[in-house]
Amino acid sequence: MGSFCRYSVVMRKIYGLILGLMLLCSAECSAQYNRDYFFWVGRKYMMDNDFKEAIRTLNILLRFDDDAYEGYFLRGIAKYNLDDLLGADADFTIAIEKNPVFTTAYTYRAITRSRLGNYDDALNDFREAIELRPDLPNPYFSRGVTRLLNQQFREAISDFDNFIKYEKKVADAYINRGVCYLYLKDTVRAYDNFNTAIRTNRENPASYNRRGALYMQQKRFDDAEADFDKAIECDSSYVLSYFNRALVYNETNRPTQSLRDLDKVLSLDSTSSITYFNRAIVRTQVGDYNRALDDYNRVAHYSPDNVLVYYNRAILYSHLGEVKKAVADYTKAIELYPDFANAYLGRSNLRRLLRDTAGARSDKEIADRKIAEYRSRLSDSTYSIYADTTRRFDRLLSFDSKMAGSSFERIAARRSDDDKMTLLPLYRFTFIKDDSTHTAVATTRFHSQRAEDFIARVGNPLLRISRSTTNIAPDSLIAIHRTHKQATHAATDDKAWISLFELAISESLIKQYTNAVNTYTVAIEHNPANPFLYLNRAATRAEMIDFISSIDNAYQRISIESDPASRLHNSHTRNYDYDDAIDDLTKAIKLYSGFAYAYYDRANLLALSGRLPEAFDDYTKAIELNPNFAEAHYNRGLIQIFMKDTRKGCLDISKAGELGIGEAYEVLKIYAGE
């Protein structure tokens, strides 16, 4: 019996141990399953090109498993595809730190650094990747592209040679090697490589386009046209071949066909500055002056620092009899390039027509002096272009052309006048109905127990703190306002401020801003130590200013134009200031120094007042209180771009994108390469 008891005790211990191990393994398997699940979902989003959702999913994975280097790697790829190059570089770096033999991470970080123009570090990463896995072909290809961009043509050829040893059926390798030979002025080998690329893949339009461009360069226009036709046959949306074929048509005196192809390019890419420029020239040649002027106006909008736009438009204005406008354009061309002798001569002739004899004489003397300098320095290509009076500036430009003052980039991706990047709006207490969007967003917000207690004390189920004003229909807002107005009459003294607070919110939501500010003021008199009342009065005061200024058609906001150093501007003569609203937020901060939203709101108003360094400090304080404050990262990033610290600004905006701000990736597309 005793032996049986001992046996049963031992068995119970063994059973308990087995059960514990089973539970432990089950927990580990569950955790592993979850990690694998998020990893799989992240990859699935990436395969569907939904990179923002991929980042959100991978963020969850990395919160639970900080050592998941593959998660950082995948998130880096997602950021790369959203043009968040700095963010991608940071994630690839973490992946490498956690796994120093992660060859693919070295390769992708190198590609990212190459796009950032950081060629030395990119080449170092490629070297690491190749040393780790010399049998992998892709690093050779990518390093070859980087060396090509860095104008190391012979070294690039060597890399493409190594890639082709492993992968003989990749047409792009032959195209790139051919381009290298072309830069080395070895057109025979360039043709050989382009021909091989075509034989390797007869459906690849890039091969025909490259060979056609070389034919065109050698004035073999029939052969060039045939290649561009074939490229378009392979891909009817291949922009480069339409563009190049338009050049061929123009060279062979077929302006109608040239215009048709340029129209097609613009239907595929409506922001291509160089295409508008070329179409303006062709339209001028056929006498379609008014539409040519429209095209020049677009180019001046997209590339405002381009000297030839103003010079050619001045000539066009002269044809149209707009002499004063022509003079203004010649003047602009001279401002952009003071050695432009032809512009002085053109302006001199027009000033003579306007009977400005002294101005005409002065321009002629300056032009003569520039021409004399040119003739004494014929070896200087700058003088040979702009001081040569025999040179014409009405030839079509290729995609590789560069013009003084700015370069026409390939398929320029400039923004329209209305597409401006603004600060994300203020936070305030408002009425919002629960919906899935608000709930999803709210989970990432700053938690303040004091604010939660305040909401609970008010006791209104619609009360939320948000940067969205409301999602309630206008008719419902009017009914809510009527209810709260009646409630204020019945409120007891100890709860009067609550009724007044709710009434003020409803008044601001129906745009009765003056009434709302007055109501908040009365509420503050009843409860002067409540920071949230000051926060809302500040938000309402700021919103009232914006509303008034919008009526004057002069929004006070930060906008980033072509020049990243653009200033805060207000096009109207009236001035609006946010001093009272800023004072309210300062009071709120004194009453509750740990409230991140108050610093964020004050930073916004300081920025709109042109006080950028102070705004930067307040955004920084908000981020210290809430490191995952996405809007604060985004707005601080914009401020840093305005203060010409583009790299740090992009890092902040990258973080904002990682935290779910979709607008971040639009900004990064513009500034990723700066």
Say what each PLM segment does.
Residues 319, 339-500, 505-507, 548-577, ...:
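Eukaryotic alpha-helical solenoid repeat scaffolds
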Residues 47-48, 81, 115, 149-150, ...:
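Register position in tetratricopeptide repeats
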Residues 40, 74, 108, 142, ...:
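Canonical tetratricopeptide repeat
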Residues 34-36, 69-70, 103-104, 137-138, ...:
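Helix-start (N-cap) detector for alpha-helical repeat units in TPR-like alpha-solenoids
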